[in-house]
Regions:
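Conserved P-loop
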Residues: 33, 37, 42-108
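Conserved nucleotide-binding/hydrolysis micro-motifs of P-loop NTPases
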Residues: 72-76, 99-103, 137-139, 174-178, ...
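Structural motif
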Residues: 38, 131-135, 169, 194
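Loop/turn-to-beta-strand initiation segments
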Residues: 65, 92, 127-131, 163-171
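Phosphate-binding/switch loop-helix module in NTP-utilizing enzymes
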Residues: 102-164
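C-terminal regions of RecA-like/P-loop NTPase motor modules
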Residues: 1-13, 220-241
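Phosphate-binding/switch region of NTP-binding enzymes
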Residues: 167, 172-232
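Pre-Walker A adenine-sensing motif
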Residues: 18-30
Length: 241
């Protein structure tokens, strides 16, 4: 079904992409802030699990501070998901959900609120605050009108994220079979696009990861098989037809 190839590089223990076992076979070097990555894919493709694996293992090793914001899922649900992956969320990870805020204020400006939260934690933790995950852009789009004004807001939001000097993982939905049909202009603005998916192989459903775009970094573009290991997701190796 798949073949494990030799390592493309050696990833240092404290690198963000080193938080997922097997990524050393896929990328030649790590990403350094400011860097914005889109994590895309259909429902059930483990986008959140991918981000939580990278973030949790990285923060456990480095002692840096990270922020995970979820628009739809509660903190309790995320924690149960992390436990099922074998991940122990560190104290230096702040998980915040917007579910209560959404119920209280239907007209809430989520991008503005997120900016204020990032600014707060940057003031509190300084350069120790290195990593941010937003789960998800699709949820924010579903709660707002996607028009020219929203696209300008998104452009400004990406500029803001870069100004905060963070490694950023933005989760967004993508339907099965589509290549780059994202809802706004974020596909052009992001430094990397990592597509999570599912393939049918030998009568089984295999979860996959594929790097479609990654600026400044040499990377393999083959579709990779992924599975749950002892400490979150792991890359098993490339899939071949």
């Amino acid at each position: 079904m798949f073949k494990v190839v030799g390592k493309l590089l050696q990833i240092g223990e404290k690198m963000l992409l080193g938080g997922m076992q097997g990524m050393e076979r896929v990328v030649q070097s790590d990403i350094y802030p400011p860097y914005i990555s889109l994590v895309t894919g259909p429902p059930g493709s483990m986008k959140s699990s991918f981000c939580m694996t990278l973030l949790t293992n990285h923060l456990n090793r480095t002692g840096e501070f990270g922020l995970y914001c979820t628009v739809e899922e509660t903190v309790d649900s995320l924690m149960r998901g992390a436990t099922s992956l074998g991940l122990q969320l560190p104290m230096n990870l702040q998980v915040t959900d917007f579910t209560e805020l959404r119920r209280e204020n239907e007209d809430m400006d989520y991008l503005k609120f997120t900016r204020k939260m990032i600014e707060h934690f940057k003031q509190t933790h300084g350069d120790r605050f290195t990593t941010f995950v937003l789960d998800s852009l699709g949820a924010i789009y579903s709660l707002t009108t996607v028009d020219e004004a929203m696209r300008k807001k998104m452009f400004s939001f990406f500029d803001f994220l870069r100004s905060m000097n963070l490694n950023v993982l933005l989760i967004t939905e993508r339907n099965l079979g589509s290549h780059a049909e994202l809802q706004g202009n974020e596909g052009f603005l992001a430094d990397a696009v990592i597509n999570m998916g599912m393939d049918h192989r030998n009568g089984k459903l295999v979860r996959t990861m594929q790097i479609e775009k990654m600026r400044h970094i040499r990377h393999a573009m083959e579709k990779q098989a992924v599975d749950v290991g002892p400490h979150g997701l792991v890359v098993l190796g490339p899939l071949f037809d």
